Amino acid sequence: MSEVVTAAPAPPVVRLPPAVRGPKLFQGLAFVVSRRRLLGRFVRRYGKAFTANILMYGRVVVVADPQLARQVFTSSPEELGNIQPNLSRMFGSGSVFALDGDDHRRRRRLLAPPFHGKSMKNYETIIEEETLRETANWPQGQAFATLPSMMHITLNAILRAIFGAGGSELDELRRLIPPWVTLGSRLAALPKPKRDYGRLSPWGRLAEWRRQYDTVIDKLIEAERADPNFADRTDVLALMLRSTYDDGSIMSRKDIGDELLTLLAAGHETTAATLGWAFERLSRHPDVLAALVEEVDNGGHELRQAAILEVQRARTVIDFAARRVNPPVYQLGEWVIPRGYSIIINIAQIHGDPDVFPQPDRFDPQRYIGSKPSPFAWIPFGGGTRRCVGAAFANMEMDVVLRTVLRHFTLETTTAAGERSHGRGVAFTPKDGGRVVMRRR
C-alpha cells in the first residue's frame, strides 16, 4: 500500500502596492528634505498603500489606512520586528529603541513602573513648579515664541523626575542635552557615514557630547547609590537601579545610560513641540480658548484633555511609525510583502483622513468629548508593543502645563494665519515657535 504524501502549501505570491516612480536617490533625498509633503503627495497619487525605495530604509510599503495600521500594530514582534536603522544610532544599543523580541518585552516591563500609578502624582508637582518658574519672566503684552519656554519646562521637569533634586551635574546636562537633541534629531533622518571624520564632523560632535554625558551619568549613579535614603527615593533613576528582571538580573551601567538618554531626549522635545502647537492653535480659536479658561477656573479637565488629543491629531509631531518584515512573506490586507521590506505607518496622513476625522482641517476638541479616539486612527505615540512607554507621562505633563498657564495668564487671540510646520529631523514644530501674546491675569 503506497503512502500518500501531502505537499506543503505554497507560500503566497508576493503582491505589492503600486510602486512610486523615480530613482531611489531622488526618493531618498526627497524623504530627508520634505518627507511629510512627499508622502502626502504620494498618498494622493497612489492611494493609501504604496511601495517606495528610500535611501536609508530601502524598499518600504507605506500605509495610510487605519485598518492596515491596526493589523501592523497587533502583529507579533516575531512577524514584524524593529525597523533598521532606528534611533538606537542616537541613543545606543542599550536603548529600548534598539531592542526587539523578548529583550524588548523585558525592558518595557522594567521601565513601566516609573510612568504609572503613584509615581505620576509625584511628577505633577515638579511640572507645575517648573512651569511657574519658567513663566515668571514671560514678557507681558509682547509677542514671543513659546517653544523655547516649553523646551525649558519639559527638560527641567524630566531631569527632576529622573534624578530627583538638582545639582551641578544637572546643570551640565542642561547644557549638553539641548544641542545634542537638535543635532541628533537632524542626523536621525540621514544615513550614518562609515568613515569617522572626527570631532569637527556632525557625528563626531554628537559622539563627543555623548562622552561628556556618560561622565555626568557615572557621577549621578554613584551619588544615587551612596544616598542613605536610596531605598526610599522615588525618582526614575532610583527605580531603575532598584529594579530587576524576572530572572533577578539588573540593568547594566551602559543600558541605564542609554535608556536615560532616550528618556531625556525623546521625553522632552516631542512634548515641548506639542505644547508649542497647543498655544498656536488656541490663540487662533477663541471659542475653544474661552471654554478652556472657564473650565480651568471651575476645576474641570475634560475639555483640556480633549484639546490635547486634538492638538496631537491636528498638528502631528511624530509623523510615522515603522516595522520590518521577518517571515518569508507577510500578508497585510490584500498585499503580500516579502522579508526584508519595511512597513511605514503614515501617522500624519491617517490623522488628516476625512473618512476617519470629518473636516480634518478643523481644530475641534469636541470630537473627543464623551468618546475616546480609535487607538488605530489616533496614533501620535505609535501603537502595539512599541507604543511610547512615556505616553501617560507626556499627556499628564501637557495637561499640567496648560492648566497652570491658563490659570495665571490671559492668552490673546489672533486672526493671523496658522504657523506652518517646520521639520527638525524627527519632530515637527511650529515654524515661528508658537508665537503668542500673554498677559498675567
Swiss-Prot record:
Belongs to the cytochrome P450 family. This is Putative cytochrome P450 138. PROSITE patterns: CYTOCHROME_P450. Its cofactor is heme. The gene is cyp138. Keywords: Heme, Iron, Metal-binding, Monooxygenase, Oxidoreductase. Its EC number is 1.14.-.-. One of its GO terms (molecular function) is oxidoreductase activity, acting on paired donors, with incorporation or reduction of molecular oxygen. Heme binds at residue 388.
